[in-house]
Amino acid sequence: MRAWTLKCSVLALCAAGLAACGGGEDDAGATQRTENAAPAPTLRLASVAPMAQVSLQPTDLDFPNPERGFYRFATDPSKITATSLLYVAQEGQRLVYTPGDLSAYRTRNLPASYLSKLDTGFANLRKQGLKAVLRFAYNYPETEADYLNAQDATLSRVKTHIQQLQPVLQRNADVIAVLQGGFIGAWGEWHTSSNNLTTPARKAAVRDALLQALPSQRLLHLRLPADLALWYPTPAALAQALSDAPPPAARIGLHNDCFLASPDDVGTYFAETAAQSQALRTYAQQASAVTGAGGETCEPPEPAQARMACADILREGAAYHMSYLNRDYYEGFFAQWQAGGCMAEVSRRLGYRLELQTVSHGSIAAPGGTLAWSVALSNQGWARPLNPRSLALVLVDAQGQAATLPLAGTDLRQATPGEPLQWSGEVALPAALASGSYQVHLAAPDAAAALAGNATYALRFANADNAVTGVQWQPAQGRLALGSTLTVQ
């Protein structure tokens, strides 16, 4: 475990140095309506078949979902075996923090053997149904002596390493929930660099290299909101994040590694004046509404100044749109949340929590014809899903064979916390679809082709089963049976 008390003493100083330096939504194929938008015009459907409407009820059950929630502290991804992280899923988590240790390569290129082991580690992560919060760094100090001697690499070496890692990141993006900045300074937290990498220009160079290495639809989370505010004074809009080519501001979020631990979160929001510090907090809240946030708590330097009560985490978890949080540190916070009776709510609300209200679809259709549909839901979590993911109707015949119909324009990142969302549209049926009766299911599979058929990576809706109506979550298939039918004739 890292030297958190030591980090507390240095991060504020580094943030002070930073301050001194001054240094279209994809809705094709669907009509969307939200509480804040003007009512959409009625969609004229080609189909005149009667509609089957399913009303659904929410559940308070706490269950795992991909790319959100508490994470467990793991190991360098090159060391992940086929069974080393099975306990994570068994304990109800779907995320692990994987610190890539580059301390042996500060002055040389990454060997092919290390890159190959990274691929193997990610393959093993995939086998265990998990995703990574990934960070690479050149040092992980645990004592004051470690910190005083902590070394990173030169800018040219860092850029070379990122270029070497690019193919690995591209190949394994499906199991990388988010990449944290890393590389610069102590713990890869973008402060206290032995190679003077914390100047605005050098930080920007590392930022650009990381964005180049990542697929455009994967997020980069950085440590200090002052960096983002300097580069992008106006936070990105949701439409930018949902575009096929999102700009840099729409690809970068924040990780706060001393969440709630002091008045300025141990330097996270350090500024010369209280007003400037509050401006950074406001910026972080606005930016995280689109690009999400995560991190961990840490040992408070002054326990009396930490915000450890249930009211604090419930208020600020929502305000900063927290998607993921370290479950292994700091235990003092978790003890307070347990004692205050909110730990279960925190676990449920980290990230997204999508409750379906109604699902409607045509009840009769022809092979090769169109099927009208509509979906109404709300997000009761603290954040949007971090990565692209859309809905699909699944038609299941009497033999259990399934036909999947992706619903265009239903990227679930559109689900704003606390607000209702409704889509409607038509979807084409396969021309070769056999006549007969089909059970209708709703699914939200992983967007990656390699994981789309893996039920472990499917998003589970926060809805209760109903034995009377036939609504039932199908864990082996990763989809929700609606209890409704479609007749194809």
How would you label these PLM feature ranges?
Residues A309-H361:
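Catalytic cores of secreted or luminal carbohydrate-active enzymes
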Residues V133-T143, L165-L197:
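Active-site groove signature of glycoside hydrolases
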Residues A40-L95, P99-D101:
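Boundary/entry segment of secreted carbohydrate-active catalytic domains
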Residues T83-T143, L155-R157, R218:
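Aromatic-lined substrate-binding rim segments of carbohydrate-active enzymes
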Residues Y114-K131, A150-V178, P200-A213:
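An active-site-proximal structural segment forming one wall of the substrate-binding cleft
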